[in-house]
A protein has these predicted regions:
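Structural motif
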Residues: 1-3, 20, 64
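A short glycine-rich, His/Asp/Glu-containing loop-to-beta-strand
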Residues: 1-14, 71
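Conserved beta-strand segments that form the floor/walls of ligand-binding pockets within enzyme
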Residues: 5, 33, 48, 68-69
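Short histidine-centered beta-strand/loop micro-motifs
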Residues: 11-17, 58-59
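Short acidic-glycine-tyrosine-enriched beta hairpin
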Residues: 36-51
């Protein structure tokens, strides 16, 4: 578990992870790109990203606060 903080316009430098991941958006806006598709990000939204899948947040106009959890079948 952790907290991702991105300032307005800050680049998200994530690389694919070896575990599944769940994101919970605490506050902010922008988009989450998973593979080649963009999903709108806003407060209280949840997202699932499977392991080894490219993804990153972008185009946030406010500070973005996201709680994340790693896991999988063996967790």
């Amino acid at each position: 578990m952790g907290l991702l903080l991105l300032q307005s316009g800050e680049k998200d430098t994530q690389i694919p992870h070896t575990s599944d991941e769940i994101y919970y958006v605490i506050s902010g806006d922008g988009f989450l790109r998973i593979k080649n598709k963009d999903y709108p990000v806003s407060q209280d939204k949840l997202f699932f990203v499977a392991k080894d899948v490219e993804h990153h947040f972008h185009s946030n106009t406010k500070e973005l606060k996201v709680l994340y959890f790693f896991g999988g079948p063996d967790s």
